[in-house]
């Protein structure tokens, strides 16, 4: 287990950037090393980059599920790691640590067991990514969430607004927005909200 100073020291410091942004880059470098060589389970389908602050497009959602159930692929990533993935929306520059969108987007992913059943509602796990409310995004936990989904759960993995661009309690509010969204759309998303779990670090 590395301590914070070790992680910061291994990052590429830029004197022109504020300390908190350098820390974001340092944590990102550490997490990238952690995830090297991971092999994703092949019995999971992923629907990525929905937006929990926008009304859902039910037709597009049904098309995504049908596409994945037929084991076809859509999107640019077609390696075995991403063979059952559907990009509901493109993320723009949401993965750029220096961008405003990285700190202020409301995208989320859902992971399902590989053989979705239109008549089944799955027990649901919501994953709140770590990072002290100022760093991190859903991609950091994609492998972990896929592993949970491979055990028979629907797993929701999401972004929330980060500090310091967004003042407290913005991140907490986004957790509430996400939960309300999946509750209101549980039927379409095949989620059993009577079997609802949350986790995070």
What kind of feature is each model-predicted range?
Residues 166-188:
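Alpha/beta-hydrolase active-site loop
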Residues 139-157:
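Short amphipathic alpha-helix adjacent to the substrate-entry channel of hydrolases
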Residues 21-120:
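N-terminal cap/lid segment of alpha/beta-hydrolase-fold proteins
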Residues 8-27, 75, 79, 150, ...:
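Residues at the C-terminal ends
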Residues 120, 183-199:
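Gly/Ser-rich "nucleophile elbow"/oxyanion-hole loop immediately N-terminal to the catalytic nucleophile
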Residues 135-139, 165-166:
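Short N-terminal helix/helix-N-cap motif within the alpha/beta-hydrolase-1
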Residues 114, 131, 154, 159-163:
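Short beta-to-alpha linker loops that shape the active-site pocket of alpha/beta-hydrolase fold enzymes
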Residues 119-132:
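Short beta-strand element of the alpha/beta-hydrolase
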